[in-house]
A protein has these predicted regions:
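Ubiquitin-like/PB1-type beta-grasp interaction modules and other compact soluble beta-rich domains
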Residues: 1-64
Length: 65
């Protein structure tokens, strides 16, 4: 299916958000995720079903100063 990840088109076979993160090489519990502008908490990622055309945002913390 085709989805968008951080604004870029992506073809994926992942059906759940947690599987997409694995496919893209994201590891750890420090990520923030949203699908179609709705935050998806860590504990819900393995149950969150992706659909054609979804807009996924994956955010990682940044150090600032």
């Amino acid at each position: 299916m085709q989805i968008f990840v951080n604004g870029e088109k992506l073809q994926t076979e992942a059906t759940f958000l947690n599987l997409l993160l694995v496919e893209l090489g994201y590891e750890g519990n420090w990520l923030a995720t949203a699908v179609n502008a709705e935050v998806v908490p860590l504990e819900a990622r393995d149950q969150f079903i992706l659909h054609e055309g979804d807009k996924v945002e994956i955010l990682s913390p940044m150090q600032g100063g």
